[in-house]
């Protein structure tokens, strides 16, 4: 490594907010299944604590050794609806409490996996888990929840979509911050290291380490160095920068897996912003030549960014996965917040951007009086984009206050202006229930 690369790396960390956003340990709970919910919850607690007891210490040790901040240490587990189905319990809050207790014991930031996979229908544990979500989120500090309601192979479970509109409203009434820890997915992935949507898929190894990196500031600085250049030059610049960022993630993941004695899973190539100035995906798009994110050309700029991040990242790492794209959460991105406040971006433009980006309508505050059927319809729209385009899409929206208010979430979650929502009703559409069939191009066999 020559001296130029060394100084580049130092600048990435000190000036451009580069960090490893998360080391997430995925833990299978299939061997914790028990017909007695209290015994099962205790087994869950014990397994998480035994497997992840050194996660925080190892993360801090690697950060100190490399001089690279590792912001979060997290755990994801097998979807709890699967574990709970063996019990006769009618409420899975005891599992949520066990997860929360384990998270506090080992000192992690979040624990994901209070989840259900219902893309083609409900099984015994699924409805119980979904109905438990509002209380589970209100009565815990670190538990995150997700529900997969559709996939390209199966279509969209519109009964589950309808139910999740209601659950998001109930979660916000139980705790205003609750919906910030709840994601509704189409095409959810099994190896996602990012919260709140992480869960440990049943096809994964018993314990794995997945890494998520963050480098919008680094990409922004690189883009600013090629003003007026052609898109060919711009694309190459983004790709090379993504390579450098991902290489660090690969190194951290390998070191963590070796020291913890578990398998290395994937590096998620997503660019994850924070509310800090200089750590914004929106500002990267503006550096490409847009006056404000949200104007015409925004979706094209995001497409270039997303694709080149993938291309650079794939070269840098032998195992990539997770969501792998650019995140555009409103509350967690200083540039997105500014664009909403200035009126340059609305829900409809955000929805268009989600056809390109890594997730979907993410960390968006909407008026508290928004009907649950309208929330369900937003979920249906996002799911349709994901299912038809064979990509992951998601909704993480927070009903709060009235249009124009400011929702303060604090920390990495930032703050969100309450956005305008179309007032026309979708109630009769959502009331139908049932399944939207899989698209014709899903039949690959």
Curated annotation (Swiss-Prot):
Coiled coil feature spans: none
CDD domains registered for this protein in UniProt: RNR_PFL_like_DUF711
Subunit and partners: Homodimer.
Family label: Belongs to the UPF0210 family.
Protein name: UPF0210 protein STER_0157
